[in-house]
Amino acid sequence: MNPNQKIITIGSASLGLVIFNILLHVASITLGIISVTKDNKVHICNTTEVYNETVRVETVVIPVNNTIYLNHEPEFLNNTEPLCDVSGFAIVSKDNGIRIGSRGHIFVIREPFVSCGPSECRTFFLTQGALLNDKHSNNTVKDRSPYRALMSVPLGSSPNAYQAKFESVGWSATACHDGKKWMAIGVSGADDDAYAVIHYGGVPTDVIRSWRKQILRTQESSCVCIKGECYWVMTDGPANNQASYKIFKSQKGMVVDEKEISFQGGHIEECSCYPNMGKVECVCRDNWNGMNRPILIFDEKLEYEVGYLCAGIPTDTPRVQDSSFTGSCTNAVGRSGTNNYGVKGFGFRQGNSVWAGRTISVSSRSGFEVLLIEDGWIRPSKTISKKVEVLNNKNWSGYSGAFTIPTAMTSKNCIVPCFWLEMIRGKPEERTSIWTSSSSTVFCGVSSEVPGWSWDDGAILPFDIDKM
């Protein structure tokens, strides 16, 4: 039998089986119908039929994501750690605001300062409600006006109109972070009835009224927060005579305590404060008598010590030559009167010694250097162990002030001391300009010695607006 015949035979057999199967099904159905129609009686079924069924059980695994996201409640900054011992100060940032402002949308500002929270540092500044190289920048040499406001940008950014965040209306200010939220304080109003508005987390929370009716003012640098309580210093009274000075304490933007400082014959303004081992230490400005700087130290109960930086090296401006100066821990040293007006500055205690900044010029706000004066915190020492120039005497400087980086940001066991330096441009020194503004540099303490240089402002004046 050939293959084709085999296929035909198999196919025929298969077809026959299919037909036979169909006939069996038809016969089965026919017999079922006949049996139903022949017997209409109801029969009770007493039989039990057992069905043995095998059930297949399958395990189905469904992956479930059990990750639970919790909102972590921020903690208050501790800030009770000691201040780090440092061997020098390294450049950290430079905003170049005036240079950029010749063509960019940069605010006219003064009194810039820096403050840090647990995750970021910000540059704060007092605007004049005007942009550089614009007609509204005219006569912005004036300190107090209704157009001034405290604003902030990330550290290192210029005070530009696109990143700036509004903090408070004011022509005098301070700001700090308690670990949970920013607190900003702006002083505004008439000279004889100014008041401060406290903002906490961007919300106005309290007000401080002028108590002497003579230009209420505050630090122009960072306040200090320790374990959820924030501290700052305010002045009310004459700039060239005995005034009134108070320490304030707040919790979540609400004033909870205040204390007036007894300091007869002394003058305190524009304090630069920092935390150190649970206390607040401030190096301030005497605008009345002293070319040495006032020192104020207080604890959480506002118990305070007040005096002057002992060092036999003067750090205010204007001042006499170092060789002609004798320091004092208790009294102002210098000539009284408005000619000894001073400038905001800073210092950091390092054991018995002190790091202090000052202008290089003894008579004007130009140049800047940082000195380590051995035993300068406790006695009238003239020993300068380190001196670093950060701005040469050919360039205008201005205010300077303190801030610190908390351990929450650095993971160190000590608080890093830092300072900022303002470089004022325009009036009053550069009379071809119709405006006054500033840029700033920032330096932080490091464990190694670093060389100096001159990180000057660098803007070329006059601007176009000055030529109109």
From Swiss-Prot:
Ca(2+) binds at residues 286, 290, 316. GO terms for cellular component: host cell plasma membrane; membrane; virion membrane. Its EC number is 3.2.1.18. Residues 1-15 are intravirion. Inhibited by the neuraminidase inhibitors zanamivir (Relenza) and oseltamivir (Tamiflu). These drugs interfere with the release of progeny virus from infected cells and are effective against all influenza strains. Resistance to neuraminidase inhibitors is quite rare. The active site is at residues 143, 399. Keywords: Calcium, Disulfide bond, Glycoprotein, Glycosidase, Host cell membrane, Host membrane, Hydrolase, Membrane, Metal-binding, Signal-anchor, Transmembrane, Transmembrane helix, Virion. This is Neuraminidase. It comes from Influenza A virus (strain A/Shearwater/Australia/1972 H6N5). The lineage of its organism: Viruses, Riboviria, Orthornavirae, Negarnaviricota, Polyploviricotina. The gene is NA.
